[in-house]
Protein backbone atom coordinates (compact mmCIF):
# COMPACT_ATOMS: atom_id res chain seq x y z
CA UNK A 1 0.00 0.00 0.00
CA UNK A 2 1.65 3.29 -1.07
CA UNK A 3 1.82 6.32 1.18
CA UNK A 4 0.11 9.59 0.24
CA UNK A 5 3.51 11.11 -0.62
CA UNK A 6 4.36 8.18 -2.90
CA UNK A 7 1.02 8.61 -4.70
CA UNK A 8 1.63 12.35 -5.15
CA UNK A 9 5.11 11.70 -6.55
CA UNK A 10 4.29 8.81 -8.87
CA UNK A 11 0.53 8.41 -9.15
CA UNK A 12 -1.28 5.31 -10.31
CA UNK A 13 -0.31 3.62 -13.57
CA UNK A 14 -3.29 3.21 -15.93
CA UNK A 15 -3.32 -0.18 -17.59
CA UNK A 16 -3.47 0.05 -21.39
CA UNK A 17 -6.56 -1.58 -22.92
CA UNK A 18 -5.69 -4.43 -25.29
CA UNK A 19 -7.06 -4.04 -28.83
CA UNK A 20 -9.18 -7.06 -29.79
CA UNK A 21 -9.04 -6.32 -33.55
CA UNK A 22 -5.59 -4.85 -34.26
CA UNK A 23 -5.65 -5.57 -38.02
CA UNK A 24 -8.54 -3.12 -38.55
CA UNK A 25 -6.41 -0.24 -37.21
CA UNK A 26 -9.46 1.55 -35.82
CA UNK A 27 -11.51 1.23 -39.04
CA UNK A 28 -15.00 -0.34 -39.05
CA UNK A 29 -14.13 -2.64 -41.98
CA UNK A 30 -11.13 -3.50 -44.14
CA UNK A 31 -10.82 -4.93 -47.65
CA UNK A 32 -8.64 -7.92 -48.42
CA UNK A 33 -7.95 -10.81 -50.78
CA UNK A 34 -8.52 -14.46 -49.81
CA UNK A 35 -5.27 -16.41 -49.86
CA UNK A 36 -6.79 -19.69 -48.64
CA UNK A 37 -10.37 -20.90 -48.07
CA UNK A 38 -10.76 -23.98 -45.90
CA UNK A 39 -12.73 -25.65 -43.09
CA UNK A 40 -11.61 -26.18 -39.52
CA UNK A 41 -13.00 -27.91 -36.44
CA UNK A 42 -14.13 -26.03 -33.30
CA UNK A 43 -12.93 -26.49 -29.73
CA UNK A 44 -14.52 -29.04 -27.42
CA UNK A 45 -17.41 -29.64 -26.71
CA UNK A 46 -18.58 -28.51 -30.17
CA UNK A 47 -18.27 -30.45 -33.40
CA UNK A 48 -18.60 -29.10 -36.94
CA UNK A 49 -16.67 -28.05 -40.05
CA UNK A 50 -16.50 -24.27 -39.78
CA UNK A 51 -15.78 -22.35 -42.98
CA UNK A 52 -12.89 -19.88 -42.68
CA UNK A 53 -10.64 -17.92 -45.02
CA UNK A 54 -7.15 -16.55 -44.65
CA UNK A 55 -7.30 -12.95 -45.89
CA UNK A 56 -4.45 -10.58 -46.81
CA UNK A 57 -5.65 -7.06 -46.01
CA UNK A 58 -4.82 -3.82 -47.82
CA UNK A 59 -2.62 -2.77 -44.88
CA UNK A 60 -0.46 -5.91 -45.20
CA UNK A 61 -1.92 -7.87 -42.27
CA UNK A 62 -2.87 -11.51 -42.87
CA UNK A 63 -5.82 -12.66 -40.74
CA UNK A 64 -8.14 -15.65 -40.44
CA UNK A 65 -11.79 -14.66 -40.97
CA UNK A 66 -15.01 -16.60 -40.46
CA UNK A 67 -17.46 -17.04 -43.36
CA UNK A 68 -20.97 -16.86 -41.81
CA UNK A 69 -24.15 -18.48 -43.13
CA UNK A 70 -24.92 -21.64 -45.06
CA UNK A 71 -22.89 -22.05 -48.24
CA UNK A 72 -20.54 -19.52 -49.86
CA UNK A 73 -18.90 -18.74 -53.21
CA UNK A 74 -15.46 -17.71 -51.95
CA UNK A 75 -12.25 -19.06 -53.38
CA UNK A 76 -8.64 -17.98 -53.59
CA UNK A 77 -8.21 -14.40 -54.94
CA UNK A 78 -11.80 -13.42 -53.98
CA UNK A 79 -11.93 -9.79 -52.75
CA UNK A 80 -13.79 -9.53 -49.43
CA UNK A 81 -14.67 -6.99 -46.74
CA UNK A 82 -14.01 -8.02 -43.13
CA UNK A 83 -15.38 -6.69 -39.86
CA UNK A 84 -14.36 -7.37 -36.28
CA UNK A 85 -16.04 -10.04 -34.19
CA UNK A 86 -14.56 -13.27 -32.97
CA UNK A 87 -15.87 -16.83 -33.17
CA UNK A 88 -15.87 -18.21 -29.64
CA UNK A 89 -15.16 -21.84 -30.51
CA UNK A 90 -12.45 -21.16 -33.14
CA UNK A 91 -9.17 -20.04 -31.55
CA UNK A 92 -7.41 -17.35 -33.58
CA UNK A 93 -10.48 -16.31 -35.59
CA UNK A 94 -11.16 -12.68 -34.61
CA UNK A 95 -12.82 -11.36 -37.78
CA UNK A 96 -15.96 -11.99 -39.86
CA UNK A 97 -16.41 -11.69 -43.62
CA UNK A 98 -19.33 -9.47 -44.69
CA UNK A 99 -21.85 -11.21 -46.95
CA UNK A 100 -23.29 -9.51 -50.03
CA UNK A 101 -20.32 -7.12 -50.43
CA UNK A 102 -17.60 -7.17 -53.14
CA UNK A 103 -17.00 -10.79 -54.28
CA UNK A 104 -19.00 -12.41 -51.45
CA UNK A 105 -22.55 -13.32 -52.46
CA UNK A 106 -25.43 -12.92 -50.04
CA UNK A 107 -27.63 -15.85 -49.05
CA UNK A 108 -30.56 -16.19 -51.45
CA UNK A 109 -33.22 -17.95 -49.35
CA UNK A 110 -32.60 -16.01 -46.14
CA UNK A 111 -35.78 -14.57 -44.54
CA UNK A 112 -34.70 -13.47 -41.06
CA UNK A 113 -31.67 -11.32 -40.10
CA UNK A 114 -31.25 -10.62 -43.81
CA UNK A 115 -29.05 -7.54 -43.42
CA UNK A 116 -26.33 -9.65 -41.77
CA UNK A 117 -26.22 -12.01 -44.74
CA UNK A 118 -26.65 -9.64 -47.70
CA UNK A 119 -30.07 -11.06 -48.62
CA UNK A 120 -32.57 -9.04 -50.63
CA UNK A 121 -36.13 -8.59 -49.35
CA UNK A 122 -38.33 -11.44 -50.64
CA UNK A 123 -41.26 -10.41 -52.84
Curated annotation (Swiss-Prot):
Keyword Chaperone attached: no
Keyword tRNA-binding attributed: yes
SUPFAM superfamilies: Nucleic acid-binding proteins
GO cellular component assignments: small ribosomal subunit
Modified residues (3-methylthioaspartic acid): 89
Keywords: Methylation, Ribonucleoprotein, Ribosomal protein, RNA-binding, rRNA-binding, tRNA-binding
GO molecular function: rRNA binding; structural constituent of ribosome; tRNA binding
Entry coiled-coil feature ranges: none
Entry-linked Gene3D superfamilies: Nucleic acid-binding proteins
GO annotation terms (biological process): translation
Family matches, as Pfam families: Ribosom_S12_S23
HAMAP family: Ribosomal_uS12_B (MF_00403_B)
Family per similarity comment: Belongs to the universal ribosomal protein uS12 family.
PANTHER family xref list: 30S RIBOSOMAL PROTEIN S12 FAMILY MEMBER
Physiological role: With S4 and S5 plays an important role in translational accuracy.
Subunit structure: Part of the 30S ribosomal subunit. Contacts proteins S8 and S17. May interact with IF1 in the 30S initiation complex.
Protein name as catalogued: Small ribosomal subunit protein uS12
Organism: Acidiphilium cryptum (strain JF-5)
Gene (name only): rpsL
